[in-house]
Amino acid sequence: MRNRFYLRWIALMLAMGLMTGCAVNPVTGESQLSLISESQEWSLGAEQYVPTQQTQGGQFYLDPELTIYVRDVGRKLAAVSDRPDMPYEFVVLNNGVPNAWALPSGKIAINRGLLVELEDEAQLASVLGHEIVHAAARHSVQRMQTGMIINAGIAGVGMAVANSEWGQMAMGGAAMGAQLALAQYGQSDELESDHYGIRYMVEAGYDPMAAVELQQLFVEMSKGQESNYLTSLFSTHPPSQERVNRNLALARELGSNGYRGRDVFEKRLAFLRSRQPAYDAYDDAIKQIQSENFQNALTNVNKAIKLEPGEAMFYALRGQLLEHLDKPAAAAEDFDKAVSLYPEMFRYRLQRGLNAYGRGDLALAKSDITDANRLVPTAIGYLRLGDIAVRENRRDDAVALYSTAAEAGGSVGEEARRKLAKLSQG
């Protein structure tokens, strides 16, 4: 299947890269291991950018102007970076977790959950500059070369893509992209990204004290671990007082009279901030689901929909709740709505397809799950397509689909292995 082919291709790139030895880090000027060429690095980032966005919530489509603003700030910083020729891209994700990430070749994302924690454009520049360094200094690539990421992908280990009991499993290349985005950086990588990110900020005209303020905020937040959401930020970008101290020393050395951009930032964030009560209600619904208070969760998600009826993720969550409450027909209407609002999102098509399968609409199930798997392959997707193949008397297809699903762990992989064994006996 495609995910296995892609992972073999990555493994082959690594093996071929053994011929290249060492190279100079384009940011630090230091010699480092180089098993992956620049062209391979760029291909990897391009291949994984959209699937990784999808597994992390998809694009924040309600306010495209916000993404344009973030992109413009990012481009200012990229232009003064040590690798200005990289094909940088910047996107805002519809994810309440305060985090940002960078894939190889400068494919960068920032969650709306982090944007609402910021106070001005200079702080945004601090975040983006930091991520630009991670990409420019090839930090993720270095981790791949030491086997810290690629091994997990080749092993076929799935990754949960939603923080709920209904979370599906991304497989193969899609799982590897998420691993790249959410991998924990070491302290040396973080210090390096802080240092050069601040220099990029100053070169682009921003006040470097914004980086100090942001790191101080993260240190304070980490002390209390105010919510599970913060775990993601602090696991991928661990804060420390040492980082605060170093940032402060560098900011004082470079001077702190740069641009802050509070007014323009607040203007650009106005729409998102106005919709925050709706996302708070959605987050409350998630918490209620985790506590198995499903009726309260339904009340909260209904509140979210009333506050922002154009948000697809609200309908998708209500559809999940209605399915749990044994109302599949009503759930189907919500999944239809989610797909109509954001047809590019794999998860909504997958959810609608699984709902259709449960209702016996095999044609819609097959179409939706196939489309979802083209975007982000999932174990549950392969499993249900295998079930459909069995019901359509396509034994060879069923064997291939079950075999792919069987690579996953958990109950889905176990069910696939059981059904595969039954087919083999037949």
What are these regions (language model features)?
Residues 18-21:
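C-terminal motif of bacterial Sec signal peptides marking the signal peptidase cleavage site
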Residues 307, 341, 374-375, 408-409:
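Structural marker of alpha-solenoid helical repeat scaffolds
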